[in-house]
């Protein structure tokens, strides 16, 4: 299989999803996922939209605020690739904000190409040492 990627502006569904995380609202922005989306972020293996929503909320609630920035977005139809940076600011202001790079692959659903069926991504590292 061959895929041809086109660099584009990020779609609204992607911006909405990141905004839900940044705002800590975890609402309709997650509607971009199918009910049974599989998400592999680093060591995470989450199955289903509600598991993704719940686990990301739990992770964010560990004591920081995130702000996602889109650097690049590439579209090959069934596969979308996102590269960016996330500012991770600790709730305890004595800690420093880190800015890890992130890369995400979004595989779209065969039956509804407006929905993500698989999400594979990596963020970080957030520190060395």
Q: Where in this protein do the model-derived segments appear?
A:
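C-terminal ligand-sensing/allosteric alpha-helical core of TetR-family HTH transcriptional regulators
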Residues: 13, 52-55
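A general secondary-structure boundary signal
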Residues: 26-36, 108, 119-121
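A short gly/proline-enriched turn/hairpin at secondary-structure junctions
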Residues: 32, 36-47, 59-62
């Amino acid at each position: 299989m061959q895929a041809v990627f086109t660099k584009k502006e990020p779609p609204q569904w992607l911006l909405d999803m990141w905004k839900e995380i940044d705002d800590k609202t975890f609402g309709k922005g997650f509607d971009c996922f199918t009910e049974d989306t599989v998400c592999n972020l680093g060591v995470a293996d989450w199955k289903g939209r509600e598991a993704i929503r719940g686990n990301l909320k739990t992770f964010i609630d560990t004591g920081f605020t995130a702000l996602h920035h889109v650097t690049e977005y590439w579209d090959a139809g069934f596969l979308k690739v996102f590269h960016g940076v996330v500012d991770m600011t600790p709730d305890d202001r004595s800690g420093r904000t880190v800015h890890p790079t992130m890369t995400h692959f979004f595989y779209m659903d065969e039956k509804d190409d407006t929905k993500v069926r698989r999400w594979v991504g990596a963020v970080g590292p957030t520190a060395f040492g």
